[in-house]
Amino acid sequence: MEKKVICQDIFWSCDGTSFVSVHNDFGIRQYLVPEESNTDKLNRNLLLPFTRFFRNQSIVSCAIDPFYTLYNENSDRLAGDRIVVGGKNFPLQLYSLMDGQCILSYDTMNKINGEYETVYSVKIDVESRVYTGSCRNKVAIYDKSRRDAVWMNQSTKKASKGRQSIISCFEEQPMGGQALSRGSLLCGSYANEMFQVDCRHQRLERLNYTRTVAGGIVQILTSDNGRYVYVVRRNSDAISIYDRRNLQHELNVLRLPFRIHHNSAKLKAYIDTAYGLSMGTPQGTILNWGRDLVEFGGVPSHNSVDDPLITSIPPESEWRTNLGSTIPATVVKNCPGDPELFALSHGGTISLCRFGG
């Protein structure tokens, strides 16, 4: 039986003129945004890749340079058309998006058994540092242009029975949003733990451990003001909200009309600076919680953040995408230059749509 092609993630360029999609057919595709201002008139079947290349093995994790653009006018910066890709039994590698050539391989070898450690999560920050997460809750930090890690640590806490001590994701910020303090970054694990990574310190600090039936953290999203953290878990029908100053206690939850199953297509949530938090559904629609709600953690103005009562907040809006109820809308990401425009994946197909349209 032929395996269905599924989009694993979408990354916009910083200027909104192009975007990259990564698929489970080992392919990495780059798209140009058409010049037509009214995308409703576009034939979505004609949205074809500008460039594409394929690896000879599956892609476990990947991340794009935050300054990625096809039109880099600043020649003093390192080229921004870069993507880092992690796979099994292979080192983490840096590729050029334009020609698909491998530029650099990072040292991810386990010195004890001589095997390459699988990088399950990766992130490039604005200071060209590459963060990697692997098994046994290990985090390493690399300079993007050097193969050897400049910082490495792992948590000594053991996961509970049946849980995986794997760093599954790093914190995601809205494009164009406020930068975090230097060196401070959250990461999550499949054992439902949250850690703080800070290369100024010599250890990985566990800030949160949730005893829940959920199957592990898959996304950590930050509000534009940086005060609230939104945590997406597998086998869950809600997105947890935390105050960044107190990650031990759940503040509120965003209620989902479906459960994020362990073996389902990758349904990803996304926060942008204009429309708040959006997420696709298995029925092909897009759920949205507005910016005002997201920026205040779902706490009404007359309530205190110390109020112990947790509120389950339903979506404020649900948009139709004309995909049909049998086609999931898996990845939804807004264009940084035009927030009403978003790239949407449905199966292995990518289309451009406008909110509310």
UniProtKB/Swiss-Prot annotation:
Keyword line: mRNA processing, mRNA splicing, Nucleus
Signal peptide: none
An example Gene Ontology CC term for this record: nucleus
Keyword Nucleus recorded: yes
Subunit description: Associates with snRNPs.
Family the entry assigns: Belongs to the SWT21 family.
Described purpose of this protein according to its UniProt entry: Involved in mRNA splicing. Helps to stabilize the U1 snRNP-5' splice site interaction.
The name this protein goes by in its record: Protein SWT21
Gene that produces this protein: SWT21
